[in-house]
């Protein structure tokens, strides 16, 4: 019986220690996860397209937010990306809309990501805040397709010749049977 009481007491102490210890985690949320853009080149280039990415801090502590681009979105000669609000702090539970402008300069298809890095705020010398060294990186996929109303002369001529040939052949067959 003494052995049972000792084990029960030890388990109770372990449970109480686990219950009062604090565990901190880091998370974040972004919307939308994907941005698809279609640009009509017949309206002329360059063209500006605006979009918004919403960043939310679901944590109980403030976080730093930094946004960077990858892939084709880094080629400023063809497409330029302007992130209007970058390197900012979010309070616990706060959501912010970040305006983004894509300036498409050349006709092509572009793919890349806008990476949103969320990391805890450093509370200074006294370190009273969250002691996390981790960061969370959330990607937003971006696909830009540039289309135009170019007239493909060669294809149109071939199509017209085929249609006229079929109509002529049909007319000859109808005459023969009449």
Curated annotation (Swiss-Prot):
Gene3D superfamilies: Immunoglobulins (2.60.40.10). Its main location: membrane. InterPro entries: Ig-like_fold (IPR013783). It is found in: Cell membrane. The chain crosses the membrane at residues 6-26, 154-174. It comes from the Archaea. Keywords: Cell membrane, Membrane, Transmembrane, Transmembrane helix. One of its GO terms (cellular component) is plasma membrane. The keyword Membrane applies. It is a multi-pass membrane protein. This is Uncharacterized protein MJ0288.
């Amino acid at each position: 019986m003494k052995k049972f009481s000792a084990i029960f007491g030890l388990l109770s102490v372990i449970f109480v220690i686990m219950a009062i210890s604090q565990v901190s985690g880091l998370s974040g949320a972004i919307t939308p996860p994907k941005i698809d853009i279609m640009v009509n080149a017949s309206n002329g280039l360059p063209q500006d397209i605006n979009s918004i990415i919403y960043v939310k801090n679901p944590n109980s502590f403030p976080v730093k937010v930094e946004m960077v681009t990858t892939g084709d979105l880094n080629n400023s000669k063809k497409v330029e990306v302007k992130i209007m609000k970058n390197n900012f702090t979010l309070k616990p539970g706060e959501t912010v809309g970040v305006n983004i402008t894509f300036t498409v300069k050349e006709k092509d298809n572009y793919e890349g990501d806008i990476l949103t890095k969320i990391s805890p705020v450093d509370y200074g010398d006294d370190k009273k805040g969250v002691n996390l060294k981790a960061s969370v990186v959330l990607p937003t996929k971006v696909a830009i397709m540039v289309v135009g109303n170019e007239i493909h002369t060669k294809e149109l001529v071939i199509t017209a010749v085929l249609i006229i040939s079929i109509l002529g052949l049909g007319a000859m067959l109808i005459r023969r049977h009449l």
